[in-house]
Design a protein with these regions (language model features):
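A short beta-sheet element
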Residues: 95-96, 106-172, 184, 191
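Short amphipathic alpha-helical segments
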Residues: 52-54, 153-155, 194-198
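Non-catalytic DNA-recognition/assembly elements of restriction-modification systems
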Residues: 3-6, 10, 14-15, 48-77, ...
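Specificity-determining recognition surfaces
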Residues: 173-198
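Sequence-specific dsDNA recognition surfaces
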Residues: 45-53, 68-83, 97-126, 144-145, ...
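Extended, domain-scale alpha-helical bundle/helix-rich regions
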Residues: 1-47
Length: 223
């Protein structure tokens, strides 16, 4: 899995060169286990003991990473409701209530190209993973089946070289943790910052596919 993180780093460098990513995306940390059996995170010249943050042990060929390292994350926005030039277009625009823990092919509302340009909306591509960040829907998920935009309560992730369904099922398993992290305000709120800082156990790519196949087999038996 450390090799996978190296490949992800190379992929990011390529995307930065192509102008598709900001240079700041390269400032990743490295998480490793020391000879003293403690976990450390190297961020530039700083090395922090993060043993307390590690929720469980993983196989030796896996690695821990921050979710910000394994994908490009971004939320959407809501074009001004009173502007008739912004709605009834042909660009899919998703509200978090529509997240179905499956694949999204269509949305209740559509926006215009003008809304997309004026309102700093992120275009989520086919295969991207979506997660709700606020309120009653917090932690609800979907995989993008058709390119779409979202409101500000939804965060999208374009994974770098990791299996999108592995990320999807990891997020599903982490829902209680996100709800806990979101407590404290008038409504639960996990924010993009909390998402990108969340730890994810990263198996080699083949293992990710095997895990997903096993999960889907179990779900099939439960139906």
């Amino acid at each position: 899995a450390q090799e996978l993180l190296e490949q992800i780093k190379l992929e990011k460098q390529k995307l930065i060169k192509e102008g598709k990513l900001k240079k700041s995306a390269l400032s990743d940390s490295v998480i490793f286990k020391g000879d003293d059996n403690k976990y450390y995170e190297q961020i530039g010249k700083k090395c922090l003991d993060i043993t307390e943050q590690i929720p469980f042990e993983i196989p030796v060929n896996w690695a821990w990473a921050r979710m910000g390292q394994i994908g490009d994350w971004g939320a959407g926005s809501t074009p001004q409701r009173g502007n008739a030039n912004y709605y009834n277009g042909n660009i899919l625009w998703l509200k978090t209530g529509e997240l179905n823990n499956g694949i999204i092919y269509d949305t209740e509302e559509k926006i215009t190209q003008k809304a997309f340009q004026d309102c700093s909306l992120r275009m989520n591509k086919i295969g991207d993973v979506l997660i709700a960040m606020y309120g009653a829907t917090i932690g609800k998920l979907a995989i993008v089946g058709e390119d779409l935009t979202t409101n500000q309560a939804c965060c999208g992730c374009t994974p770098y070289l990791i299996y999108n369904w592995y990320l999807f099922y990891f997020l599903m398993a982490s829902r209680d943790s996100f709800i806990k992290k979101g407590e404290g305000g008038a409504q639960p709120n996990i924010s993009r910052v909390k998402l990108v800082e969340h730890l994810i156990p990263l198996p080699p790519l083949k293992e990710q596919h095997r895990i997903v196949a096993q999960i889907e087999k179990l779900f099939e038996q439960l139906r």
